[in-house]
Design a protein with these regions (language model features):
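Catalytic-core regions of glycoside hydrolase
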Residues: 1-195
Length: 195
């Protein structure tokens, strides 16, 4: 994204959507949010927030990537000198943002998985972010997390949803969002949250 700040932002977690994770989604379609009547797993799939196994799998995959990367850097600091020196800046935040163009749940499923209506996309985004942060904080209690308020999930979440204090939200009000004017969306966020 190229935005600057006191710490680097991680961006979309497309890196999670490979190998074992994607295979697990394909083997367990109820883990995938029902998008346009389909639970087909692909690189834009997001976890079904109504399925605890799905949200746990997402959080575990991110935690494992973080642990593996940290162990690699700290296991050979001379080989990874630049990454080691810049570790706190680049990895102060653990990215928990779904893949770009994520297929959020929008279709009621009356068959195998559940018959629950999905809330709006920003509610799904921040429900998943809260669950993910809460789970990963048990292993990395000093970490902060990063998500975007962007595109179809740019809107402020419903009043019933709070955002974990360890989650930093990067508001992107000018790209692909249809909620309101850029300043209108900014004002709604700033009036409600300090994340």
């Amino acid at each position: 994204n190229g935005m600057l700040g006191s710490a680097g932002f991680s961006g979309h977690r497309g890196d999670v959507m490979t190998g074992n994770y994607l295979a697990t989604l394909k083997d367990n379609p109820c883990y995938v949010a029902n998008y346009n009547g389909s639970r087909q797993a692909n690189s834009r799939s997001v976890p079904d927030i109504n399925n605890t196994m799905a949200t746990d799998l997402w959080a575990n995959a991110i935690e494992q990537k973080q642990t593996q990367y940290k162990n690699t850097i700290f296991g050979n600091t001379s080989l990874y000198a630049n990454q080691y020196r810049n570790y706190n800046y680049n990895y102060e935040h653990i990215g928990i943002e779904v893949p770009d163009g994520g297929n959020w749940g929008n279709s009621k499923d009356n068959e195998v998985c559940n018959a629950v209506d999905y809330p709006k996309e920003s509610d799904q985004q921040f429900t998943l972010a809260n669950l993910t942060a809460q789970k990963i904080l048990t292993k990395f209690p000093d970490k902060r997390f990063q998500v975007y308020a962007y595109s179809t999930h740019a809107d402020v979440p419903s009043a019933s949803i709070t955002i974990n204090k360890n989650i930093d939200v990067q508001l992107i009000p000018t790209v692909y969002q249809m909620e309101s004017s850029t300043n209108g969306l900014r004002n709604r966020w700033y009036n409600r949250f300090s994340n």
